[in-house]
Amino acid sequence: MKVTQEKLPASQIGLEIEITPEITKQTYEQVIKNLASTANIPGFRRGKVPRPILLQRLGTTRIKAAALEELIQDGIEQAVKQEAIPAIGQPQLRSSFEDLINNYEPGKPLTILAAVDVEPEVNLVQYTDLLFQAEEVKYDPEQVDSSLEKERQELATLIPVEGRSAQIGDIAVVDFKGSFAKAEGEDETAELEPIPGAEATDFQVELQEDKFIPGFISGIVGMNPEETREIAAQFPDPYANEDLAGKAATFIVTLKELKEKELPEINDDFAQEISDFETLEELRASLVERYQKEADDKTKTNKQEALLTELLKHVEVDLPLTLVEQEVDAMLTQTAMRLSQQGLDVRKLFTQDIIPQLRERSRTEAIERIKRSLSLREVGKRESIEVTPEEIGVRVKELLEQYPEEKEVDEDRLRSIVENELLTEKTIDWLLEHSSVELVPEGSLSPAEETEAAESDADADVSQTEQENSEPSTTEVTEG
């Protein structure tokens, strides 16, 4: 079989495949033979239909199309194997099938044009002496006090309040019912329209302004037990439930009980109750170490991300569609698994309407992921960065000890995953050693909100769908 190769854009190899007259004839005859043995034509037993009758009944075009399908499939498969092309994904036919049928004559040569995706070539214009900035995350001593105070609040004892009205920090037990406030000029005698889900009995709420929509908590402050009050509140705009965004509301609230928190002292006894440490000093030292490590880890991650972002500016690679689609598939699968573990119904979230949108929104990140992976692999090859079996074994052992409940583990696959992770880590460390990074204060390069938003586009889409498909609840109405 004569095969001519041609380099195409998007990391494709074009193939011009010339199929010999013998094969075009042989395939055609075999198709007729197969059809003759299976065709059900009145007046003839199967396998005994005369050739002219078979051709007349089935039609030459249908028979040629069946033979052509076999020629195309076998021809491309043999060409890829003959030329030892490391193809990825499914080959694509570049010739028009209609033109091939018109040109196909059994016993004469047939030329087929096809294309296959292959691993892309990575051109690293520069990968050493890179210059970039990264945000340095510093340990904040206040984190320790905040952590201890949070634990202290969790251990609070609720004591009934007597002789005073509600104030910020109290725990109130209320009945409430919410309605839409009347618009200006609306009939004062008309009944208020209830807000769906904005009704509760014996609802316990901590009087903290940031936990509910503006006006609700401040309206309760100053109330006495058994008192009923009409409270005006305003839904913020934007708001999770778009139907309520920016709308004014009226709540009829009855304060049934009022309690205050009695907080424990932060001492050695407190430390023993919330941890395995004997003294408060030991607990504080442990928290300092933990938050210091978290800060160092975040700084390290920032340096790695900044490095990879800078590296991609100096990489030239033409990605095949197959790799991009495979990465998009993997990303959506990971998102679905994560949402399923959170108890969400993935079938309701990943509808036929939203999947194409998610695929399109995931494409940019998928392309960046692939470029990163290919670039790091190329650096590893050029610099002969390797991982030893001993290093793999140590990491595998750590993982197995970390998850002892996992009984059915494919250790070969686990070792392969670990090898890739270690190789990536080593390559990034090598690049950092051969680059220059300037550490700048946290928050000085880009707002954290933008970073978090960029990382959760897909989750945001499916979460919005979940909101649209669910009934409103008390917390949806009242929480800000």
Swiss-Prot record:
- Comp. bias regions, Polar residues: 462-480
- What's the EC number here? 5.2.1.8
**Where are the stretches annotated Disordered?**
441-480
Gene Ontology cellular-component terms listed: cytoplasm
Ordered alphabetically, the record's keywords are: Cell cycle, Cell division, Chaperone, Cytoplasm, Isomerase, Rotamase
Quote the catalytic activity from the record.
Answer: [protein]-peptidylproline (omega=180) = [protein]-peptidylproline (omega=0)
Q: From start to end residue, where is composition biased (Acidic residues)?
A: 449-460
Please cite one Gene Ontology biological process associated with this protein. Answer: protein unfolding
Domain PPIase FKBP-type: from-to ranges: 169-264
Q: Tell me the compartments it is located in.
A: Cytoplasm
Role description: Involved in protein export. Acts as a chaperone by maintaining the newly synthesized protein in an open conformation. Functions as a peptidyl-prolyl cis-trans isomerase.
What information about domains appears in the record's comments?
Consists of 3 domains; the N-terminus binds the ribosome, the middle domain has PPIase activity, while the C-terminus has intrinsic chaperone activity on its own.
The protein depicted here goes by the name: Trigger factor
Q: Which organism is it from?
A: Nostoc punctiforme (strain ATCC 29133 / PCC 73102)
- Gene assigned in the entry: tig
